[in-house]
């Protein structure tokens, strides 16, 4: 994303398919997020309950992209 993207940490609460998830952010807001290309290429599995880093666009704060899965 652009330099002005907002990076936040959250927890996956629901998985829709292999690359769409509902993530509850630290501040309690739930956003729909998809996985980034690097996570898809390296076949990193994201499950319900995982802690992830999400980048949010400043234009639409209801959608984001999962850029990192914490261990």
Swiss-Prot record:
InterPro entries to which the protein is assigned, alphabetical: NA-bd_OB-fold (IPR012340), RNA-binding_domain_S1_IF1 (IPR006196), S1_domain (IPR003029), TIF_IF1 (IPR004368)
Alphabetized GO MF terms: ribosome binding; rRNA binding; translation initiation factor activity
Compartment annotation: Cytoplasm
Keyword terms: Cytoplasm, Initiation factor, Protein biosynthesis, RNA-binding, rRNA-binding
Gene Ontology cellular component terms for the protein in this record: cytosol
The keyword Ribonucleoprotein belongs to this UniProt entry's keyword annotation: no
SUPFAM superfamilies in UniProt: Nucleic acid-binding proteins
Residues annotated as signal peptide: none
Broad class of where this protein is predominantly found: cytoplasm
Record-annotated S1-like domain positions: 1-71
Family: Belongs to the IF-1 family.
NCBIfam families: infA (TIGR00008)
Function: One of the essential components for the initiation of protein synthesis. Stabilizes the binding of IF-2 and IF-3 on the 30S subunit to which N-formylmethionyl-tRNA(fMet) subsequently binds. Helps modulate mRNA selection, yielding the 30S pre-initiation complex (PIC). Upon addition of the 50S ribosomal subunit IF-1, IF-2 and IF-3 are released leaving the mature 70S translation initiation complex.
Protein's recorded name: Translation initiation factor IF-1
Originating species: Mycoplasma mobile (strain ATCC 43663 / 163K / NCTC 11711)
Classification lineage: Bacteria, Bacillati, Mycoplasmatota, Mycoplasmoidales, Metamycoplasmataceae
Gene this chain is encoded by: infA
């Amino acid at each position: 994303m652009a330099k002005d993207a907002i990076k936040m940490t959250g927890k996956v609460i629901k998985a829709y398919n292999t690359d769409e998830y509902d993530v509850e952010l630290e501040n309690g807001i739930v956003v729909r997020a998809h996985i980034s290309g690097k996570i898809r290429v390296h076949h990193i599995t994201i499950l319900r309950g995982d802690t992830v880093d999400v980048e949010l666009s400043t234009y639409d704060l209801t959608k984001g992209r999962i850029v990192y899965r914490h261990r």
